[in-house]
């Protein structure tokens, strides 16, 4: 069977995602679609609007054949690690192509990757600018191009991962449809995920922008999971933990632990905390990721250890997806997981399990232990 892969968050699954899926099937001429999807926390480190099982269900009911979870140690990362991890799973699953959205699909991303080789990496040490800002300054000098739009940044990261790892699948960019990624208003049937989340938080009308299945799921949520609700746990951890413990937290560097600890002591709410912590050196997304790893007490050592042992955690599939798994199962180089037992909880999937337990503050649904895949016939 010919397979096409997609890297997704589906936060939530909307009509733009359905268009992406339809185009992926069309231009790849694939028999089966495989989506590698972030779990309960996004690349930016934010809790998803509904849990991973609900999003996987909506995806399969709208035509995705197989949904695999992107482990936390790949999912909550800067673009290059997020993309590299996702592509490694799709490569392990034997996909023939990967289709992704881009604001500028006509760009030669391989040329941009090649241009990066000439960068002066030693100059990326300015503390008054983020890495992304310094990267774009050099990229513009070399090529005249700047990577600003989120999907273009990921397109660059996918291309770089493919080149560096020597993957043989084909990368097929398509033009992103509808609203801008950051648009906060719903203006038609295709809207950005952030606009849909905004409409839900304001009790506005979003149903025209999502398929019925996703709309029905969203109608059941009482409130949107937000960092404002997690902040008391984060604040307690930052105040109580010694600096030496905070220093070992994944992504914590350059004395950020001192700044976050002081911010927690001064700030009673999350917005004030972030305002105090934010500097020109770090993006908001980077700080959110550090906050998540802090609250989960995940260390640099743990991420390094677990990322050496990736796996394929099946969230949902249909008949076509089941047939594809049966076809590739014997050739898989990574463990295929369909139900998490206690040994997996304590070892292989421990980071995802901890993230799932944190997410259960927003939902009564068990997120990992003994949860079987969703099967849509």
From Swiss-Prot:
Keywords assigned: ATP-binding, Cytoplasm, Ligase, Nucleotide-binding, RNA-binding, tRNA processing, tRNA-binding
EC number(s) on file: 6.3.4.-
Residues that bind ATP: 7-20, 101, 151, 176
Disulfide bonds: none
Gene Ontology biological-process annotations: tRNA modification
UniProt family annotation: Belongs to the TmcAL family.
Record's protein name: tRNA(Met) cytidine acetate ligase
Record lineage: Bacteria, Bacillati, Bacillota, Bacilli, Lactobacillales
Gene that this polypeptide is encoded by: tmcAL
């Amino acid at each position: 069977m010919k397979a096409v892969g997609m890297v997704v968050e589906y936060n939530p699954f909307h009509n733009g995602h359905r268009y992406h899926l339809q185009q992926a099937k069309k231009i790849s001429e694939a028999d089966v679609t495989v989506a590698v999807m972030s779990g309960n926390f996004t690349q930016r480190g934010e809790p998803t609007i509904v849990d991973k099982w609900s999003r996987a269900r909506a995806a399969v009911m709208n035509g995705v054949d197989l949904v695999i979870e992107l482990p936390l140690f790949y999912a909550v990362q800067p673009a290059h690690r997020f993309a590299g991890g996702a592509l490694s799973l799709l490569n392990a699953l034997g996909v023939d192509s990967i289709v992704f959205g881009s604001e500028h699909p006509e760009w030669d991303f391989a040329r941009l990757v090649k241009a990066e080789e000439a960068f002066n990496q030693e100059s990326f040490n300015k503390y008054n600018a983020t890495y992304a800002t310094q990267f774009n300054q050099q990229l513009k000098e070399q090529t005249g191009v700047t990577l600003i739009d989120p999907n273009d940044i990921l397109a660059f990261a996918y291309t770089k991962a493919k080149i560096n790892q020597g993957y043989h699948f084909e990368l097929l960019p398509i033009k992103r449809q509808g609203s801008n990624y950051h648009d906060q208003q719903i203006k038609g049937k295709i809207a950005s995920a952030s606009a849909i989340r905004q409409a839900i938080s304001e009790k506005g009308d979003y149903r025209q922008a999502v398929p019925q299945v996703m709309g029905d799921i969203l109608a059941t949520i009482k409130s949107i999971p937000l960092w404002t609700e997690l902040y008391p746990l984060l604040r307690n951890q930052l105040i109580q933990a010694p600096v030496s413990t905070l220093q070992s937290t994944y992504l914590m560097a350059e004395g950020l632990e001192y700044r976050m600890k002081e911010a927690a002591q001064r700030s009673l709410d999350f917005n004030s905390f972030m305002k105090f912590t934010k500097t020109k050196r770090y993006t908001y997304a980077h700080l959110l990721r550090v906050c998540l790893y802090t609250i989960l007490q995940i260390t640099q050592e743990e991420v390094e250890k677990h990322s050496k042992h990736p796996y394929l955690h099946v969230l949902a599939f249909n008949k076509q997806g089941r047939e594809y798994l049966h076809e590739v199962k014997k050739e898989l180089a990574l463990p295929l997981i369909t139900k998490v037992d206690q040994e997996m909880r304590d070892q292989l999937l421990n980071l995802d399990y901890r993230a799932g337990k944190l997410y259960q503050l927003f939902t009564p649904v068990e997120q990992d232990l003994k949860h079987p895949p969703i099967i849509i016939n």
